């Protein structure tokens, strides 16, 4: 099987996954302010929440407004970031934010937030293509909304 993502009917999954989604929703909607409160209301432990929070997402009926956050470590060389930006443009990603730290020991940390609602490929393909860029040392998926 290729890829890490599956679409699964929640009726066949353990109830804990839906409870994690519920806790995330409580936090997102501002109904609770702290993770402890969200997990208590959802009926799960904090450790369960932290274990699954970055891996469980609600399926959106529409692709509008979908965002992905990923981090990279790049070498301090001319053209590396430009090559990554070209890939993001080519696949139809809309860059919402870029945050780049100062290079230390020849490496810089870069964080991207991308609107993926108009992308022509899946996230894994995009990240794999970015990893192939000369000067990109590491690519890490952080979150998806």
From Swiss-Prot:
Q: What is this protein called?
A: UPF0735 ACT domain-containing protein CPR_1404
InterPro entries from the xrefs?
A: ACT-like_dom_sf (IPR045865), ACT_dom (IPR002912), UPF0735_ACT_dom-cont (IPR008310)
Classify the source by domain of life. Answer: Bacteria
Q: Which Gene3D superfamilies match?
A: 3.30.70.260
Protein family according to the UniProt entry = Belongs to the UPF0735 family.
**Which part of the chain is the ACT domain?**
69-144
């Amino acid at each position: 099987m290729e890829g890490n993502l599956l679409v699964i009917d929640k009726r066949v999954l353990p109830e804990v996954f839906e409870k994690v989604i519920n806790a995330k929703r409580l936090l997102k909607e501002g109904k609770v302010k702290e993770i402890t409160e969200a997990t208590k209301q959802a009926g799960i432990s904090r450790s369960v929440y932290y274990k699954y929070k970055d891996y469980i997402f609600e399926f959106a009926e529409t692709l509008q407004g979908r965002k992905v956050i990923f981090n990279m470590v790049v070498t301090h060389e001319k053209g590396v970031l430009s090559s990554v930006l070209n890939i993001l443009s080519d696949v139809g990603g809309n860059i919402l934010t870029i945050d780049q730290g100062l290079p230390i020991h020849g490496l810089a940390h870069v964080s991207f937030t991308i609107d993926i609602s108009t992308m022509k490929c899946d996230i894994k393909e995009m990240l794999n293509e970015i990893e192939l860029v000369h000067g990109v040392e590491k690519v890490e998926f952080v979150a998806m909304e």
